[in-house]
Every structure is written in C-alpha cells, then in structure tokens.
C-alpha cells in the first residue's frame, strides 16, 4: 500500500510538473572545478537559499554547495502537502530519495530504539519535506534569546520585520467548511513580503473541528493568530502552501522563481572549510566526483543544518579540541560547545476510531486515493492539500496536572517565560501509534484520529559529534530525549490531557468505542510513560548545536551576528545557530535569521 500511494500520487505530480514546466531551470548549475566567489554557502536549504538569494540580489557573486538536487525530479510527490508523512516515520525504511537518512541509535529515552531522523537532502532542504506549519515565537521567548546573546536586536518587535520579509500571506479560501474558518491577523504580514507563500489548505480536516470544540470545553481559548507574538490557545494554523495550486512552498520553489546571478554545485559534498595562517576562512574543499576548491573572497557561510553544520566545523578543526585530536585533525579553534546543547521536540499520543473522514482512508481505499489525487492535480483541491495536522493548540499545564511535580520539576519549568507554553497539541487526522511508518501502519477498516502531545519546553539536551574526519560518514546523533525527570513528568501530563480531550462531551458524537491505542488498561503514570518511551518520535526540530551567545560563554559557538568565535570570515546561519529553540515550529525563525544576517552582511560588510 505504501508503494501504491507513492506511485499514484507521484504520477499525478510528475505529469503536473511536465505540463506546468515548473522546474526552476534558471539556476546556474556548475560542475567540479576550482572557482572564486564573494560568498560560498554550504547548504541549499531553508536558510542557505534565503541568504544566498538576498546576497545575489545585491550583485555579490554567490556559490551554493548542495549535496542533493531538485526535489521536483528526485521525489516530486513532496510537492503534495498530503504526502508529507510518507517519509517521516521512525523506521529508517521510510527514508525518501530527498532524505539524508540520519538515525539516532539506541536512544535511551525511547527504550533504546533506533530512530530515523528525516532531514532534507535537496535544494530547499527540510522546507521541501516538513509539515509546513508556519507560526512565530512568543514575545518573551525572543526576549530570552536577546538576553542570552546580549543583543536587543533579537527582541520580537525588532525581528518582526525580518519574519515578514520572506513571506507573502493569502487569507483562507471561502471554500473551506463554515466551521473551519481560521482567525488571522493580516497586519502580522507585509504586502511587500516575498517570496515564500503562507496560507491555509483549501480543505480542512473534519476531525479538527471537533478538536476545536473539545479544547474550548477544557478551558483553552481560541487564539486570534499565532504570528504576532502570542502562542497560547488554539486555532487552525497557517502553512507554507501555495494557495493557487495547493502545493508546497519551499525555499527552493519560492526563491528560484526570480532570475539571479548565483551558482549552484549540486550533488556536491563540502569536505572541509579552508583557512589561512591568520585563521581566516578562505574557501571550501568540495567533492563532486573529484575534489576542488571554491574560494571565498569575503566569507564562507555554513547552512548545513543542526547535524551537519557542527560536523563540518569539527572536521575543519573547530570544536572540542579532544575531538580534533582523536581524529588527527589540526585544531583551528577550541570551541567545546560545537555539537552540544541540542534542543528538540518529541511527540506521542492516543488514537481512537472516529465517525468522520480522516487520512486513514487514503491508505485503505485506492479509489478514494485516486479521486483525491485527481482533485489535487486538476484544481489544487481536496484532502491532499492538507498535511493532516491543521489544528494547533498551546498551553502551560493547568495546576491539576502539576500536582505530582517536585519542587525541582517546577523550578525547571520556571526558567521558561510566562508566555512560553509547555505543551503543544496537534489534531492528527490519522492513526499515530508508534509512527514507525505513518501510512503502512494505518488500520485497514474504519477511520482513525489522534491527538498528539508535543514537548515544547524540554529540559533534556542532546549532542552531535563526528565518527571520522570525513563528512561522508554520518554524524553521531544523541538526542537524549526524556533524560530528565521533568520531561518525563510533562510528557505523562500531556498524554493525560490528550486523553481528556477525547473524553469531552464535545467529542462524544464522533468517538466510536474505547481508546484504540494504546488502550485504557495503560492508566498509571509508569504505564503511560512506558507507552511514551515505546512510541515517541521527534517532530524534527533539532537545533542549537552551534549556539549563538556571548564571548564569555565557553559553550557559545557564534556571536549575535552569526560569526564563529576564534576565526574570521566564517558564519553559521541555520537552526543550529539558535541559542534556544523557541516554542512551536521553527521554520519561520530560520527564515527570519537568514534575512537578519543577510542584512547585517549587506550593511556592515564582511
């Protein structure tokens, strides 16, 4: 069934692509050979393409080194929002052609399971494969960011123009169900913002309308919007979706729509950052069949993501000195924080059989799948315009949920500002289970839905390191999920809250039978925690592994202008650069950071 879904939808997408001539051929593609540019950017993902485009717009000569190619050719199905779960499972066998295929091995907090960690390996990076949710951090979370890096330019009101710069907002279509009209604040966006498209799916999940009522019943308020600095409450969420045709809007599809003088090295692997005797970054050693050098007369910018940005630094001699010495790498800068401080969000949740249509039907009924693929292909309509998780809620846990928390647990949570939620809930119009393979594991009879709990104020921290001096060898990823007692307590409380939502009077008309998964026999805190450990999955928000900070912080890797400490001519611009992972979904913040640093470079030079 998994292959059938991929085959049918891929066929429609590929035909659609051929007809629309949508492939961005205006990219200047170059093959192996020494060359010189003003800026060399490693990674053509969410941040990399954004900063490359802004610099190219100012007539700088920019090269982008990308290990993948066009996702439209490698895996065209990813253009369809409803397909995003296909490659997102915990089982590495769900890996797609545009996925690096990282695996966090024997994760202790997940009962020593090996967990597949999807990351985009293509132009567009993870913006080409994520679940597309677009919302911004809270005001006080950005105040904490500004405090940690000692730079008021990161206060919410000061970064808001950079959030607005990348995106163009379209209000929801009137074709949605009457009870699924999203609230939004149009002033949170700029009419001049371009080119990433932010809107709403034309189709709203029916289950989400029932979750909305249940959230009201347990005391959460509907939010006006999640893009003006407040996250508490619940609403239909905005997404990076092209409203006209119902397709994904990625950094590649967005920024490639305009002609620019930039150069791309595709299917090319950055092997090492090169330095002169003054520890100035002078270029990048690249492999694309043969090795060659791209010289940067101004700067090298690393935008390789939370796993490979620290990896590239370490193999280049920047990182903990003991790591360099272990693998015979010359030490350029001893920065012990490289690869440390990894933040992430994990999810889990119960599932019920329900009396409304859900995505389960796509996996069990080929004719329905075919009809929906046709609806998407011919008009950008139908269920495939929706990635399934279109309703979002955030809260700080109520006092009753904290009754079993120790003083230490409460102190841990007190670090987070008052507008920083502890838990996020997603209305999942699908069976979640252990998320090993989101489509293959769907029940074959009936419709199923889940309420997913997500830790968005985690205390546990992971790390990333290298296994050799070669970037071709996958980095070692140790996420350390649920390492702390506080994270365990919050997880159990969130699971109980998800169950409470299913038990509301509001939800009763659509619930069929008892809890399908894991089953109400799992009721004690220890039993629920064991279910969580056996089933939890990352929601793909790894960050902070090259954290921004002040020079007196030994664990800081870059300053507030994204410049790497201990060297010159080198910056890191992606989610690894975050000092903290703000609550919610980070793609908006990655775009913001890339816009902000691009302006810094343009104004202040290198």
Model feature map: region roles:
Residues 2-606:
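N-terminal redox-cofactor-binding region of secreted/periplasmic oxidoreductases
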